[in-house]
Amino acid sequence: MKIDPVELTKKLISFKSITPKDDGAIEHIAAILKKSGFECEILEFGDKVKNLYAKYINGVPNLCFAGHVDVVPPGELKDWISDPFKPEIRDGMLYGRGAADMKSGIAAFIAAIVDSVAGKFRFSGSISALITSAEESTEEHGTKAVLEWMKSKQKKIDFCIVGEPTSSEKLGDTIKIGRRGSATFKLICHGKQGHVAYPELADNPIYKMISILSKIKDTTFDTGNKYFQPSHCEITTIDVGNNTNNLIPSSIAAGFNIRYNNIQTLDGLYKLIDEICSSVTNDYKLSMQSSRNVFLSIPDRNTDIMLDAINKITGIDAVLSTNGGTSDAAFIKDICPVIEFGMINKTAHQVNECVSIDDIHKLTAIYKEFIKNYFYPTNKILNQINVIGNTPDGPLLA
């Protein structure tokens, strides 16, 4: 069975899978994989949020590809040059919501794994796919829930590739080997309401908040390290809720987010922010919520295999990066080593989201090359494994 990754991308775009709905995309992928001998489990969590775990069982190790079919809303339809859920090809580019993030990535790895299990070469090992419809929103019902289910069923993954759009300028220029953590803070400062003409009878909390936020913004959390940029804070909201211009408010709220590296800990960040607040006032309330923790996959043999695959197909020497936002790799790292690699991310979440047709084919070829060398290591690393024989299609592994 041969899958055209471009046609599959177009089909996936046609599903109006605005997060956390899949609109039939999960079932469509499962049907394709079942025809190729994969055992498929469609899992529903929460308010019928659908996920898929599919596995072609052929021993160990288990190489998994992961991704999400859900997309963010398209925004104003009038701003699109075509219907975001009716894929169109123009000048070698495929347009549609999810084209970059990340339906083309899913189509590429589905085409690659189907072709690999149906190919001429023999290999010892399993290939699986973990696909969710809840990456962009209700994360507790998506990949995180699937991994908990897998643990309960003693289903293991040895290595995972998340097909998120990691490339910046050209396909193959960036592999993500980790991600910064995200900690969101909410701060409320209290004061005493009063008339602006009698400030001595009131206590304006706005000045307290300004002082605290200034101190936080001026804080150097760290200077980064070999793998990570410095941790940094961005103030995202300030709200007084006061529409009266002669009234000193009784309270003020602010929100800010810290993207932190592996030098920091959540407890340490909270303690630092709390100390800054208490240095200004004792009348405040501070809370913190963490969505995804920082993680790092130390480069190893599998990273080298991906670097070689990218170079062979594109001629590009990829860089290893931890920049950018969070992803479900932050959950997967708790059960196995994980890297992220996929399409160019320039138009992700934007109006007129698009990807190159040529890049879809190249990404498929890169994934296929990785699969081949993951199970059939190249000569430079054959001495690291036990080879028990050779076939016309490559070494037969123990």
Curated annotation (Swiss-Prot):
<feature type="binding site">
    <location>
        <position position="136"/>
    </location>
    <ligand>
        <name>Zn(2+) 2</name>
    </ligand>
</feature>
<comment type="similarity">
    <text>Belongs to the peptidase M20A family. DapE subfamily.</text>
</comment>
<dbReference type="Pfam" id="PF07687">
    <property type="entry name" value="M20_dimer"/>
</dbReference>
<dbReference type="GO" id="GO:0008777">
    <property type="term" value="F:acetylornithine deacetylase activity"/>
</dbReference>
<dbReference type="Pfam" id="PF01546">
    <property type="entry name" value="Peptidase_M20"/>
</dbReference>
<dbReference type="InterPro" id="IPR005941">
    <property type="entry name" value="DapE_proteobac"/>
</dbReference>
<keyword id="KW-0028">Amino-acid biosynthesis</keyword>
<dbReference type="GO" id="GO:0008270">
    <property type="term" value="F:zinc ion binding"/>
</dbReference>
<dbReference type="InterPro" id="IPR036264">
    <property type="entry name" value="Bact_exopeptidase_dim_dom"/>
</dbReference>
<feature type="binding site">
    <location>
        <position position="349"/>
    </location>
    <ligand>
        <name>Zn(2+) 2</name>
    </ligand>
</feature>
<comment type="function">
    <text>Catalyzes the hydrolysis of N-succinyl-L,L-diaminopimelic acid (SDAP), forming succinate and LL-2,6-diaminopimelate (DAP), an intermediate involved in the bacterial biosynthesis of lysine and meso-diaminopimelic acid, an essential component of bacterial cell walls.</text>
</comment>
<keyword id="KW-0862">Zinc</keyword>
<dbReference type="InterPro" id="IPR050072">
    <property type="entry name" value="Peptidase_M20A"/>
</dbReference>
<feature type="binding site">
    <location>
        <position position="101"/>
    </location>
    <ligand>
        <name>Zn(2+) 1</name>
    </ligand>
</feature>
<feature type="active site" description="Proton acceptor">
    <location>
        <position position="135"/>
    </location>
</feature>
<dbReference type="GO" id="GO:0050897">
    <property type="term" value="F:cobalt ion binding"/>
</dbReference>
<dbReference type="GO" id="GO:0009089">
    <property type="term" value="P:lysine biosynthetic process via diaminopimelate"/>
</dbReference>
<dbReference type="InterPro" id="IPR002933">
    <property type="entry name" value="Peptidase_M20"/>
</dbReference>
<protein>
    <recommendedName>
        <fullName>Succinyl-diaminopimelate desuccinylase</fullName>
        <ecNumber>3.5.1.18</ecNumber>
    </recommendedName>
</protein>
<keyword id="KW-0220">Diaminopimelate biosynthesis</keyword>
<dbReference type="GO" id="GO:0006526">
    <property type="term" value="P:L-arginine biosynthetic process"/>
</dbReference>
<comment type="pathway">
    <text>Amino-acid biosynthesis; L-lysine biosynthesis via DAP pathway; LL-2,6-diaminopimelate from (S)-tetrahydrodipicolinate (succinylase route): step 3/3.</text>
</comment>
<keyword id="KW-0170">Cobalt</keyword>
<feature type="binding site">
    <location>
        <position position="68"/>
    </location>
    <ligand>
        <name>Zn(2+) 1</name>
    </ligand>
</feature>
<feature type="binding site">
    <location>
        <position position="101"/>
    </location>
    <ligand>
        <name>Zn(2+) 2</name>
    </ligand>
</feature>
<keyword id="KW-0378">Hydrolase</keyword>
<keyword id="KW-0457">Lysine biosynthesis</keyword>
<dbReference type="GO" id="GO:0009014">
    <property type="term" value="F:succinyl-diaminopimelate desuccinylase activity"/>
</dbReference>
<dbReference type="GO" id="GO:0019877">
    <property type="term" value="P:diaminopimelate biosynthetic process"/>
</dbReference>
<keyword id="KW-0479">Metal-binding</keyword>
<dbReference type="InterPro" id="IPR011650">
    <property type="entry name" value="Peptidase_M20_dimer"/>
</dbReference>
<feature type="binding site">
    <location>
        <position position="164"/>
    </location>
    <ligand>
        <name>Zn(2+) 1</name>
    </ligand>
</feature>
<comment type="subunit">
    <text>Homodimer.</text>
</comment>
<feature type="active site">
    <location>
        <position position="70"/>
    </location>
</feature>
